[in-house]
Curated annotation (Swiss-Prot):
GO terms for molecular function: 3-oxoacyl-[acyl-carrier-protein] synthase activity; beta-ketoacyl-acyl-carrier-protein synthase III activity. It catalyses: malonyl-[ACP] + acetyl-CoA + H(+) = 3-oxobutanoyl-[ACP] + CO2 + CoA. Keywords: Acyltransferase, Cytoplasm, Fatty acid biosynthesis, Fatty acid metabolism, Lipid biosynthesis, Lipid metabolism, Multifunctional enzyme, Transferase. Belongs to the thiolase-like superfamily. FabH family. It is found in: Cytoplasm. It holds the Pfam family ACP_syn_III_C. One of its GO terms (cellular component) is cytoplasm. The active site is at C112, H251, N281. This is Beta-ketoacyl-[acyl-carrier-protein] synthase III. Catalyzes the condensation reaction of fatty acid synthesis by the addition to an acyl acceptor of two carbons from malonyl-ACP. Catalyzes the first condensation reaction which initiates fatty acid synthesis and may therefore play a role in governing the total rate of fatty acid production. Possesses both acetoacetyl-ACP synthase and acetyl transacylase activities. Its substrate specificity determines the biosynthesis of branched-chain and/or straight-chain of fatty acids. It comes from Clostridium botulinum (strain Okra / Type B1). One of its GO terms (biological process) is secondary metabolite biosynthetic process. It is an enzyme of class 2 (transferase). Residues 252-256 are annotated as: ACP-binding.
Length: 326
């Protein structure tokens, strides 16, 4: 059976920077309050860029980085909870924009774990078919589902997109996954969709649930446990000691979650790459944005051992062990 490796990365974030100080002018908060509780200093917010645009720009970068053509792609998966349309899918729209005429395309919704889920689905599809190359994108326009009057949530989120290209290779690359879901606790992180109204049914149930709602304490507890479980499982499957792992690239939600997880794992927090201070929580986009940033900075070398780990609404969580191949 063929191995699967990451051969290219890309990302896009809006130019519009929203600082903590600016947010303190629209809600009752402060830079000190946000910074000490989350580690976030600023975030990028769309001024017209939609999910399709951001996903497309990240895809173009990844294609260029992988030194391939768009028509080499056999599969496009977009992980998003903020699509522009119910149909066509974001993936089909990206296909149109980049000219990937040979690709099978679809979206998945797994919130902040979406990129990890997308990688696992893509690996399975590549290994068990004629397909050779896949484009996985995490893209979010979270600013449109944030309640800008809720100081507990509006300070957390940002917009952006990140992408990775996978390919069948001779050398080892993507090694092991650990992915789980816990719908029993889904009520702790929610966002409503359409009101359940038609001419036969008038229902006000969803009218007050069109924005992100979060039980911060429960999500914090869940996140630390989920990240720890995932990393322990990946260690067991790969037989890696954490001292061998160059970086852990986690979902960029909150610096305190990462710090508590590092303590639980008895490892230095510096092993966890963090860029949430600049971008905030970009949900499914956070891991691929971080991965692309590291790739561009030259922080990763061939055969480096890295672990990606995500957690989010659903509740969902998962991770993957990778031998870096670029």
């Amino acid at each position: 059976m063929s191995n699967i490796s990451v051969i290219g990365t890309g990302s896009y974030v809006p130019n519009n920077i929203i600082t903590n100080d600016f947010l303190s002018t629209i809600v009752d908060t402060s830079d000190e309050w946000i910074r000490t509780r989350t580690g976030i200093l600023e975030r990028r917010i769309s001024k017209g860029e939609n999910t399709i645009y951001m996903a497309t720009e990240s895809a173009k970068e990844a294609i260029k980085n992988a030194n391939i053509e768009a028509n080499d792609l056999d599969l496009i998966i977009v992980a998003t909870l903020t699509p522009d349309n119910f149909m066509p899918s974001t993936a089909c729209s990206v296909q149109k924009e980049i000219g990937a005429i040979n690709a099978l395309c679809f979206d998945i919704s797994a919130a902040c774990s979406g990129f990890i889920y997308g990688l696992e689905i893509a690996c399975s599809m590549l290994k068990n078919s004629f397909r050779n190359k896949a484009l996985i994108i995490g893209a979010e326009n979270l600013s449109k589902i944030v309640d800008w009057e809720d100081r507990n949530t509006c300070v957390l989120f940002g917009d952006g997109a990140g992408a990775a290209i996978l390919s069948k290779t001779k050398e080892e690359g993507i090694l092991e996954f650990h992915s789980r879901s816990n719908g029993l606790k889904g009520e702790h992180l929610t966002c409503g969709a359409l009101e359940a109204n038609n001419i036969f049914n008038k229902d006000d149930m969803l009218k007050n649930n069109k924005f992100i709602k979060m039980n911060g304490k429960e999500i914090f507890r869940f996140a630390v446990g989920a990240m720890s479980e995932t990393i322990y499982s990946i260690q067991e499957k790969t037989k890696w000691d954490l001292s061998e792992v160059k970086y852990i690239i986690s979902h960029q939600a909150n610096s305190r979650i990462i710090e508590y997880t590092a303590k639980k794992l008895n490892t230095n927090k510096d092993k966890f790459y963090m860029n949430l201070d600049k971008y905030g929580n970009t949900s499914a986009a956070s891991i691929p944005i971080a991965l692309d940033e590291m790739n561009k900075k030259g922080l990763l070398n061939k055969q480096d051992k890295i672990i990606l780990v995500g957690f989010g609404g659903g509740l969902t969580f998962g991770g993957v062990a990778i031998l870096w191949s670029i």
